[in-house]
Amino acid sequence: MKPNIHPPYRTVVFHDTSADAYFTVGSTIATERTIERDGQTYPYVTLDISSASHPYYTGKQKEFAKEGSTARFHQRFGSFLTKKTN
């Protein structure tokens, strides 16, 4: 295996700005910013969305109609599809 070709693996603090949640995990992401937490200095990365704020994980996802697409189509355009008898 070739030496010095892999990025350094280190502990990084990710900050979800929309939920104001911090995650300390191992990562190879490159960043110039740092933050001090628990008496140590870590690389710092901001996130727009994470599991702390994503609607799928928070349970605040939008509910779609219980009917299928065919039922919605007939509801919207059903009057145009009825056969007229003269």
UniProtKB/Swiss-Prot annotation:
GO terms for molecular function: structural constituent of ribosome. Pfam families: Ribosomal_L31. Induction: May be induced under zinc-limiting conditions; in that case may be repressed by the zinc uptake regulation protein zur. Gene3D superfamilies: Ribosomal protein L31 (4.10.830.30). Keywords: Ribonucleoprotein, Ribosomal protein. It comes from the Bacteria. One of its GO terms (cellular component) is ribosome. InterPro entries: Ribosomal_bL28/bL31-like_sf, Ribosomal_bL31, Ribosomal_bL31_B, Ribosomal_bL31_sf. GO terms for biological process: translation. Belongs to the bacterial ribosomal protein bL31 family. Type B subfamily. Part of the 50S ribosomal subunit. This is Large ribosomal subunit protein bL31B. The gene is rpmE2.
